[in-house]
C-alpha cells in the first residue's frame, strides 16, 4: 500500500477545461486489487478518514499519460483525471505502481484466465463464509495440521511460502510447528482479514501477508517449504494447482511441498436411479402442450445439457464395477504446463455384470514429510469432505459382463474459465459397443442432500426382516435371565433396543469402540420411540405390591435409585450417548458432519485413538 499526501485532483468541466475536483488537498492511497490496483482518494484532516472517490485501475481498461515531473493523467471508465502530486518522488512512486500493473497484464495467470472468471473467483473466496466453509471441514483442516505437526523438523527455523493463504490458517500451523517466517500470499480481498488475524495473534514479525497473485508478486528470498490447499473437485478443478506449481520458482533446491503428490482415482459405476433422475429432467421438454406451446424441439438440447453436468455428491463404493485406475501427479517434479491437457488411459476389468452408467472420480493427496507420510483422502470409503466425490454420466450407458474389459481414455482439457472440459471415450473390448460424452466441470450439479448413503440394490445376502426379529428375540431371551435377580418382567425381558438392534443401513455417530458413545454403542432407534406393549400397567401394579412388602427405609433407597436412573435417561428421541451433541452439531463445509454417515469413529486430536490422515496399514487411516 502506498500513500501520497497533499495531492490535487483535476477533471474536465463542461467547457473541456481542467478544474479542481475538490476545494482541498487529498491523500492518494494505492492498494492491491484482484483486478489491478485500487486508487482511493481520502479527504485530508478528516477524522476518521473520509473516502471521496475510488478508481479501479486495470492494465487493460486504463489509459495513462505523464504530464511533467509532478503530474500524471489517467482515463478511467471514460473519465479523465489529472493527479498533481506534492513532490516528484510521489509522482515517480505512482508511475512505478502503474508500470508494474502494466506488466501484470501479461502474467501467466491473466493469459490463461478470462477476466469475468477471475473476478467471480476472487470475489467468491473473499467472503468469510466461504473460508469458514473450508475451515469447518474437519478432515481437511485437521489432516493439514497433523501433517505439519508430525513433520515439525521440516518447518523449524525455516522460511515458508503459503500459496493462496485465504484466512491464513495454514500459515498459523507452520508457525506453530516452528517456522521462522511465513510469506502468506493471497490474491482475493481475504488478504486484509488474514492480516487482521495475524495482527490480533501478535505474529506480524513471523507471518507476512502479501496481497497479490503468486504469478505477479516478488519475494525477498527463496523458501524452504511451500504449503497450500490447491485442490478442487476432481483434484484439478479451478486450476489452482497450476498456481501452486508456479510457486516453485521461489523454492530452494531440495525444498519441501505440502502436499507433495496427488492421485486422481477413476472407476466405472452403476446407478440406475441417478441416470433416470437426469434423464427425466430432460423429459420436461417432451411436452407438446405446455401452456399451448410445443417444447419438443428443445428436448435433445436439454438432454445434452443435463448430461454435460458432473454430479457432485457421495455414494456407496459398492456401486463401482471395477478397481479404480490411479493417475498420479508429483507436485515436486510436475510443470504447470503438464496440467493444460491431462490424458488418463483406462482399462477396467469388470468385476460384476450390469449397466455402466459412467465414471466416478475422487482423489487422495500425500504429504511426504521427513518424519512421516500423511494422506488426505476423498474416497467414498473415508469420512466425507467438502470435495465430496464426482460422477460423470454417459448419455448412452454400456451393458457389461463380469470378466469383460472396458477400455478407453479420459481427457481433461483446461479452459480459460479456470476449469476443465472432461472428455470420456469408452469401448467394450471384443465388441462394437462404445460410448462417449463431454462434460463441463465448471457447471456441476450439486446433488448432495445430507441423507445417509443408501447401499446399492442387491447388497443384502440375508433377510433383513428375519435378522431384525432374530435379534429382538435373542435380546428378550437374554433379559429374561433378570428373573433370577428377582426383577419382575412379566415373563419376557424388557427389550433394550439401544444396544442390540442397529440398522446396518444406518451408519453410527461418534467416538466409541464401535462408532458409538462412551460404551461403544450408538442406537439408531431410541427405546422411547417404541410404543408400549401393554405390560407397563402390570409392572406398575406388581411394583406397588413389592413396595408395600418392604420397609420405609428400603422404599426410600429404591426411590433414590429410580430418580438417579431417570436423571441419566436421555430425552425421548435422543440417542443415549454423551457424544451426541458434539457429533450432531459439528458442521462440515457448512453442511452435515461426515461422521453422521460414516462408520469410522470421529477422530480426536491429541489422543491415542484416532488421528485423521495418519496411516496404519495400507490405505487405512487413524
Curated annotation (Swiss-Prot):
Q: Which residues are involved in binding S-adenosyl-L-methionine? A: 131, 140, 164, 186, 215, 243
Region of interest (Disordered), residue spans: 513-556, 602-622
CDD domains referenced in this protein's UniProt entry, alphabetically = AdoMet_MTases (cd02440)
Mod. after translation = The dimethylated protein is the major form.
Q: Which residues carry this modification: Asymmetric dimethylarginine?
A: 478
Gene Ontology biological process terms, A to Z: chromatin remodeling; peptidyl-arginine methylation, to asymmetrical-dimethyl arginine; regulation of DNA-templated transcription
Q: Which terms are listed as keywords in the entry?
A: Chromatin regulator, Cytoplasm, Methylation, Methyltransferase, Nucleus, S-adenosyl-L-methionine, Transcription, Transcription regulation, Transferase
- Name the InterPro entries on file: Arg_MeTrfase (IPR025799), PRMT_dom (IPR055135), SAM-dependent_MTases_sf (IPR029063)
Q: What are the recorded GO MF terms, alphabetically?
A: histone H3R17 methyltransferase activity; histone H3R2 methyltransferase activity; histone H3R26 methyltransferase activity; protein-arginine omega-N asymmetric methyltransferase activity; protein-arginine omega-N monomethyltransferase activity
Compositionally biased intervals (Low complexity): 536-556
Tell me where in or outside the cell this protein is found. Answer: Cytoplasm; Nucleus
Start and end of every SAM-dependent MTase PRMT-type domain? 118-425
| Enzyme Commission number(s) from the entry | 2.1.1.319
Q: What class of enzyme is it?
A: transferase
Catalyzes what? L-arginyl-[protein] + 2 S-adenosyl-L-methionine = N(omega),N(omega)-dimethyl-L-arginyl-[protein] + 2 S-adenosyl-L-homocysteine + 2 H(+)
Q: Which GO terms describe its cellular component?
A: cytoplasm; nucleus
Purpose: Methylates (mono- and asymmetric dimethylation) the guanidino nitrogens of arginyl residues in proteins. May methylate histone H3 at 'Arg-17' and activate transcription via chromatin remodeling.
- Assembly: Homodimer.
Q: Which family does it belong to?
A: Belongs to the class I-like SAM-binding methyltransferase superfamily. Protein arginine N-methyltransferase family.
Q: What is this protein called?
A: Histone-arginine methyltransferase CARMER
Q: What organism, scientifically named, is this protein from?
A: Anopheles gambiae
